[in-house]
Amino acid sequence: MMQLIHHFIENGDEVSFVSSAKDSVYQEDLSQLEISCSFVQLNDRSFNTFVEELNPDVVIFDRFMTEEQFGWRVMDSCPNAIRVLNTEDLHFLREARHKALKRGEELHVGELRSELQLRELAAIYR
């Protein structure tokens, strides 16, 4: 995600970072990059008002669960915003690899089929 943030900054774009996660000692200090950071509540209509006021041109979701939670709200509130799912890390593939590793076996294609795969692919297609 930081590579994307740096790319947009280098192109002169204004970047806003929005998260529903609590602050952590492990998070990047985005204020050094002059990025506005905001906290939003999950399952709360206040996000709709927030994103309408922000009125972004592009919204990047860092994982499919974030797209599931907020994508439809962005679509409703900012229908012209381009919505992008960052797929540098496919969670269904990571989970399948982890299970195969725990069993000490190779990963087989059939093991990729899961509810997680369907959810993540649905987020990509949206």
Where are these regions (language model features)?
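N-terminal subdomain of nucleotide-sugar transferases
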Residues: 1-28, 32
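A short acidic, amphipathic alpha-helical/loop segment
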Residues: 3, 29, 49-50, 69-74
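Structural motif
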Residues: 18-22, 41-42, 61-65
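Conserved nucleotide-sugar phosphate-binding/catalytic loop shared by glycosyltransferases and other
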Residues: 25-46
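Short N-terminal targeting/anchoring amphipathic segment
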Residues: 50-69
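Short, conserved loop/helix-junction motifs that constitute active-site signature segments
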Residues: 54, 74-79, 124-125
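Active-site proximal beta-strand in glycosyltransferases
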Residues: 78-95, 103
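Membrane-proximal helix-turn-helix segments that form the acceptor-binding/catalytic region
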Residues: 108-126
